[in-house]
């Protein structure tokens, strides 16, 4: 999940390949891209990370059409003489980020002073409402809001699996946004997940990735609109 949240533009299959070959990778490029950087060198003889991409479709002699997968290599910055890219993320105001987390989501939200359950966020399926406690800690809200919103989007009758998949998605969402995820615990993997084939694992991860992408797209759309509005105000001045 760490790999998929960091390399979120990569497919699930390629995320698994990165994890299998270099789980500590941070910045991947093809050799030709690295070579365009002045003074670049590989650190000795390095094996590239083998990934897959869709090749050019072609027609076989029998008339059937084939779309092949082509193997290509990527190199991590740690395999080069270049310094690691400094991770810099501008601190986003909690109020703005919380608004982004609830922006245009598929559930209705209601803010209450106190929730009778004692939780900071509670999903009521009968009312189709997500209740949020006013004044709750932002770090808690990010995690629970993302988890409950994702859970509401999962179409399944298995509550145990729904809980686990929504927790995985919430972890990846918060990790991507730089929110502390140290309190997540994944020791409760459902028994049905433990015996999945590699194909079935990819399928489950693919569904989680789609949920994460949908949530992150809404967050990004809100943040872009805020940034655009801010630039317009600066221009008017």
What do the predicted segments below correspond to?
Residues 1-237:
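N-terminal accessory/interface modules of nucleic-acid-binding and processing proteins
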């Amino acid at each position: 999940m760490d790999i998929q949240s960091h390399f979120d533009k990569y497919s699930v299959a390629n995320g698994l390949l990165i994890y299998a070959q270099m789980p500590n990778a941070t910045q991947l490029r093809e050799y030709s891209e690295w070579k365009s950087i002045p003074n670049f060198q590989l650190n000795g003889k390095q094996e590239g990370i083998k990934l897959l991409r869709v090749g050019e479709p072609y027609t076989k002699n029998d008339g059937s059409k084939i779309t092949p997968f082509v193997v290509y290599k990527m190199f991590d910055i740690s395999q080069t003489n270049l310094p690691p890219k400094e991770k810099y993320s501008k601190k986003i105001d909690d109020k703005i980020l919380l608004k982004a987390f609830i922006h245009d989501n598929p559930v209705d939200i209601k803010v209450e002073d106190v929730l009778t359950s004692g939780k900071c966020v509670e999903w009521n399926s009968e009312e189709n409402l997500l209740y949020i406690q006013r004044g709750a800690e932002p770090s808690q809200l990010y995690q629970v809001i993302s988890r409950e919103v994702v859970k509401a989007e999962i179409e399944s009758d298995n509550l145990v699996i729904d809980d686990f998949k929504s927790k995985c998605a919430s972890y990846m969402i918060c990790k991507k946004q730089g929110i502390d995820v140290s309190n997540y615990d994944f020791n409760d993997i459902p028994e049905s997940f433990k015996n999945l084939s590699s194909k079935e694992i990819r399928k489950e991860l693919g569904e989680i990735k789609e949920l994460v992408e949908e949530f992150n797209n809404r967050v990004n759309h809100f943040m872009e609109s805020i940034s655009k509005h801010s630039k317009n105000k600066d221009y008017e001045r």
